């Protein structure tokens, strides 16, 4: 249990028995609002609580007066060394140094398992991510969402969830017809025809490889086949080839999905029809007309009666059409059928990773999941923004004249998988990210992945060069008394809290920020050793101080390794 969690537990125990003006806290919903957290300004103490402010709403007493009563009660908590009140009623604590020293002992005993917490309790979570159209190899633009989804899955597994990683193959839309036509042209090209890639077709040279496969299997036989037979063959061969490419690209990033679900297979299994029938049973479908969509003024638009889902009953802005004019299902109908399929497989919690251009899908999909599950299932939709690729500040062209894009393979060959994974997590997922090819391979503190890996490598260099140290139970850690040492220990103590909040908010970038902060504090402490021999990790003729500092350094190594493992990044023990 983290220091913050320990103090919060003690405070709750005190509040359960405390009587203020005949008010005793018995309602757990009140305690759910209780915060014990780290202040933004360390001058305000190690931790603070809003307990007095929360209670003032129920006791009808000035929060400063309540805080003074609480201070008398909380002062007996053994981990607290001093306590004070600041307006409008926050209570600040400093924690005993012995508590912080115990953190070093705990980390060295648990090693990379320090900070592990289980609040998932084996609950199943479905995370769908990537789901790129199977019309070509994955370009680098797909990497951010892919890495985010994979790391989020790792993170949720770390806190006790059973995670299923899923990829939805969009193999039933109009893009597949375009793919088939584009591949057929390349097949003709292999046969010796001069071809013209028309507007709207896929021009990528990679399609020629599929044309060659078809030629090897069928020679010129496809030319004489009827359209439907030829389409089926080209479709099946193309999808098999391209999904193989996509899986290989994902493997280069260190990503492997558990399940690949086919849109066309769901259609064959009548999942859309079953989903619509369920919504009809719930009386959530009607026939009506919609207002003209915003932004289409001046376009020849006519209202028409269509099948609509009552998504506004569940928080959406407008009701949604399920059928097109020709009777085929809309994209949205297929999307909600897919989530109906997930729910039917027993998933009560789903996470969907999408590009930020899909923001309009958030409310409608949440409405659909709520309707289909009677409110028993939830979906959390995480959006990721674009990545600007630069080379020493200059924009990198993402596409070539051939119609091919900068691929994941291109980038990994240039900078390596682990660098790509780390850099993609250095910003909140919905914020635009700059990826500079020159900067991500720099060996400087301006390169966060180098800075963190260098800290881990420094720890291992120190361990390799250290003399034999004392057993940990024999070390007097009170010799770690400098401001910089105590700051580093307090940072290390936050690791469990960082893991927990990152998982609960589905924001793995918080771990990146934390690892950079740890590396910065460790490098700063190392730098003080260059200025003063008394601050070095290895101090001649002082085995106790050397041992204490080595265990502190090892703690840094264990925590950094634990964080990088969540990212599926190999912690380096020496820099190349």
Curated annotation (Swiss-Prot):
The keyword Protein biosynthesis applies. Its EC number is 6.1.1.19. InterPro entries: aa-tRNA-synth_I_CS (IPR001412), Arg-tRNA-ligase (IPR001278), Arg-tRNA-synth_N (IPR005148), Arg-tRNA-synth_N_sf (IPR036695), ArgRS_core (IPR035684), DALR_anticod-bd (IPR008909), Rossmann-like_a/b/a_fold (IPR014729), tRNAsynth_Ia_anticodon-bd (IPR009080). SMART domains: Arg_tRNA_synt_N, DALR_1. It is found in: Cytoplasm. PANTHER family: ARGININE--TRNA LIGASE, CYTOPLASMIC (PTHR11956:SF5), ARGINYL-TRNA SYNTHETASE (PTHR11956). HAMAP family: Arg_tRNA_synth (MF_00123). Belongs to the class-I aminoacyl-tRNA synthetase family. This is Arginine--tRNA ligase. It comes from Ehrlichia ruminantium (strain Welgevonden). The gene is argS.
